[in-house]
A protein has these predicted regions:
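Terminal targeting signals and extreme-terminal segments of soluble enzymes
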Residues: 1-81
């Protein structure tokens, strides 16, 4: 991955995507084919039993997968079902 793409993805993953910032997700590391995205748990992210809500966990997986794919494709992509 180029330095330029790395920088763009880090800005996108940490500052530019409203859904990610709203849900406190942070991209902490990127490499070719991999992405580390962290998700601190907040009360808004929990289900009624106090565990992580399944929707937020799937969102985390979707974000990490999309970021990892972008490192290989060398371009911005959108994930779809």
């Amino acid at each position: 991955m180029t330095k330029d793409l790395y920088d763009k993805l880090m800005v996108f993953g940490n500052d530019r995507e409203p859904f990610l910032t709203h849900n406190f997700m942070r991209t902490t590391d990127l490499d070719d084919g991999t992405a580390t995205v962290t998700l601190p748990m907040h009360t808004e992210s929990l289900n009624r039993w106090g565990g992580a809500h399944g929707g937020i966990l799937f969102s985390l997986c979707d974000v990490a997968m999309g970021m990892a794919i972008m490192t290989l494709r060398q371009e911005m992509v959108v994930t779809v079902n």
